[in-house]
């Protein structure tokens, strides 16, 4: 029997599996499996409706489900699912870039900024945040008892999707 040839890594990132680490792919696979309620290998409107119901959100509008499914170029199998996440994440700035933006407001390098100050900056500068966006940010990343926002953790979560252990 002839020796097996090693698979070449696809250059230029066109292979969606090369965009993620193996552990990330496994996590996406687990999420896909949970969402594929009828276990047919595809996520469709019925699967999405069942997933929302399992999360306690009932009465999801059919139009909303259709819009979600339409985001895919075709039937949503695991590869399409992974590709969709890859495309969404591709535009995310690297963690260091986001950290550097926050460091402008933290010349002493403490790793935190007064929440009131960052709120003022985000609501008054170019690309203004709405009050609702500020509320969402502080709901997800509440300031500490001293009123400081831990921007290092915020940056980590923005770029990695989960808090550091």
Curated annotation (Swiss-Prot):
Entry GO CC: cytoplasm; mitochondrion; myosin complex
Q: Which PANTHER family match?
A: MYOSIN REGULATORY LIGHT CHAIN 2
UniProt KW Metal-binding keyword: yes
- Per its UniProt record, what Pfam families does this chain match? EF-hand_6
**Which positions bind Ca(2+)?**
36, 38, 40, 47
Q: What is this protein called?
A: Myosin regulatory light chain 2B, cardiac muscle isoform
Q: Which organism is it from?
A: Gallus gallus
Tell me where in this chain the PTM N,N,N-trimethylalanine is found: 2
The extra comment attached to this record reads: This chain binds calcium.
| Subunit comment | Myosin is a hexamer of 2 heavy chains and 4 light chains.
> What does the PTM comment of the record read?
The N-terminus is blocked. N,N,N-trimethylalanine, found in other myosin light chains would not have been detected in the N-terminal tryptic peptide in PubMed:7319048 because it would remain trimethylated and ninhydrin negative after hydrolysis.
Q: Does the keyword Metal-binding apply?
A: yes
Keywords from UniProt, A to Z, are:
Calcium, Metal-binding, Methylation, Motor protein, Muscle protein, Myosin, Repeat
- The UniProt record lists the EF-hand domain at 23-58, 93-128, 129-164
- Please list every transmembrane segment annotated in the UniProt record, as residue ranges: none
Molecular functions (GO terms): calcium ion binding
SUPFAM superfamilies associated with the record: EF-hand
């Amino acid at each position: 029997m002839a020796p097996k040839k090693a698979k070449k890594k696809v250059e230029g990132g066109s292979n969606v599996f090369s965009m993620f680490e193996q552990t990330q792919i496994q996590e996406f696979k687990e999420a896909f499996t949970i969402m594929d309620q009828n276990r047919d290998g595809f996520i469709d409107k019925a699967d999405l409706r069942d997933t929302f119901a399992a999360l306690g959100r009932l009465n999801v509008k059919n139009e909303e489900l259709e819009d979600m499914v339409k985001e895919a170029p075709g039937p949503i199998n695991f590869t399409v699912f992974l590709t969709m996440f890859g495309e969404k994440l591709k535009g995310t700035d690297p963690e260091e870039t986001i950290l550097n933006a926050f460091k402008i407001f933290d010349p002493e390098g403490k790793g935190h900024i007064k929440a009131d100050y960052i709120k003022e900056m985000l609501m008054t500068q170019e690309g203004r945040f709405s009050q609702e966006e500020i509320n969402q940010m502080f709901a997800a990343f509440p300031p500490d008892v001293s009123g400081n926002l831990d921007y290092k953790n915020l940056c980590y979560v923005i770029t990695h999707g989960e808090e550091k252990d």
